[in-house]
Curated annotation (Swiss-Prot):
Keyword presence, Transmembrane helix: no
Residues the entry annotates as binding Mg(2+) 2: D223, E224
EC number in record: 2.4.2.18
Keyword Amino-acid biosynthesis part of the UniProt annotation: yes
Pathway(s) it belongs to: Amino-acid biosynthesis; L-tryptophan biosynthesis; L-tryptophan from chorismate: step 2/5
Keywords assigned: Amino-acid biosynthesis, Aromatic amino acid biosynthesis, Glycosyltransferase, Magnesium, Metal-binding, Transferase, Tryptophan biosynthesis
GO BP: L-tryptophan biosynthetic process
This protein's name: Anthranilate phosphoribosyltransferase
Gene3D superfamilies, sorted: Nucleoside phosphorylase/phosphoribosyltransferase catalytic domain, Transferase, Pyrimidine Nucleoside Phosphorylase, Chain C
Disulphide bonds in the chain: none
Length: 331
């Protein structure tokens, strides 16, 4: 590791194979915490390259616990985190909204590293027991139209660095990697990122894959569609900026999306959205993220129709019933 760190400190970049080997060594415990923290710090000081990102991703996908749910052609809705906004669990709520609308979802998530509550915190608050058994995940898809993959069960490197990430409490290149390494390799993905350079990096990376995707970024820094500002949506060969008003939504204030101070707070907000008792801002931000996910699956549908499908799922109680069945089956 010493030679690697010297190379990076001299402002050199890693090759794809080199990055792949380094992450494999991290997963195998070949470096101590101080060395790993030093490596992470390098990528806080400069942008990661495409070759480095792809190499790290290669390692995680090679080491993953494979899960074949391809027959469901599922979507994942996931953000990098690390935007410093501490929102409630918008993408998780959007996943259940999309599943309630009849589209298969495989959510890949983790505990919060830079926020109060990640998707796994909310699932755990509901008594969900995480599993890496394909038969149980397939049953969840068949019965509920959604399965949940707790990242550390499927990616040993993510588990190995979890304590370091939590101790640092700032975004790291592992935030960038999380959305890229869903072990199912879903057919569709809606990916949220915390800045425009990463939006371009993700778009470039996904153009080489078979996954149909959209990458979203709110221009005021959110790693999801926040409705607090204009937002950009990038797909293969296309980028477009939307305003909340152009889609029929009022702008939100940042305070209206806050996730609270504890996982319990975040779960109460999540439940209020599912129950239909949340604020208009909280419901709308879930609806718009779910709508753009549906648009990834059905690009021929106008976005207005996708918004209507997402709204109907949430407001009719279909999303709530999906969550209820999911918790009963997986608790």
């Amino acid at each position: 590791m010493k030679q690697i760190l010297y190379k990076l400190f001299e402002h050199q970049y890693l090759g794809r194979d080199e990055a792949r080997t380094i992450l494999q060594n991290i997963a195998q415990g070949k470096y101590n915490d101080a060395q790993v923290a030093s490596l992470i710090t390098v990528f806080l000081m400069r942008n990661i390259s495409v070759e480095e990102l792809c190499g790290f991703r290669d390692a995680l996908l090679e080491m993953r616990v494979p899960v074949d749910l391809s027959e469901f052609a599922p979507i994942d809705i996931v953000g990098t985190g690390g935007d410093g906004k501490n929102t409630f669990n918008i993408s998780t709520a959007a996943c259940f909204t999309v599943a309630g609308a009849g589209f298969p979802v495989v959510k890949h998530g983790n505990y919060g590293a830079t926020s109060v509550s990640g998707a796994s915190n909310v699932m755990e608050q509901h008594g969900v027991k995480f599993t890496d058994h394909t038969d149980r995940l397939r049953r969840s898809m068949e019965k509920c139209n959604i399965a949940y993959l707790h990242a550390p069960l499927f990616n040993p490197a993510l588990k190995a660095v979890a304590p370091i990430r939590k101790a640092l409490a700032v975004r790291t290149f592992f935030n960038m990697l999380g959305p890229l390494v869903n072990p199912v390799i879903p057919t569709y993905q809606l990916l949220g990122v915390y800045n425009l350079p990463l939006l371009r990096l993700y778009t470039y990376t996904y153009q080489e894959s078979a996954t149909r995707f959209a990458v979203v970024h709110s221009l005021d820094g959110y790693d999801e569609i926040s409705l607090t500002d204009e937002f950009k949506v990038a797909t293969c060969g296309n980028e477009k900026i939307y305003t909340p008003e152009s889609l029929g939504f009022n702008r939100c204030r940042e305070s209206e999306l806050d996730g609270g101070n504890t996982p319990e707070d975040a779960t109460r907000i999540f439940d209020a959205v599912m129950e239909g008792t949340a604020t208009e801002a909280q419901k709308n931000v879930v609806i718009v993220n779910a709508a753009f996910a549906i648009r990834v699956i059905c690009p021929e549908k106008p976005i207005e129709e996708c918004i209507a499908l997402a709204r109907e799922s949430l407001e009719s109680g279909k999303a709530r019933e999906t969550l209820k069945k999911f918790v009963e089956l997986n608790g």
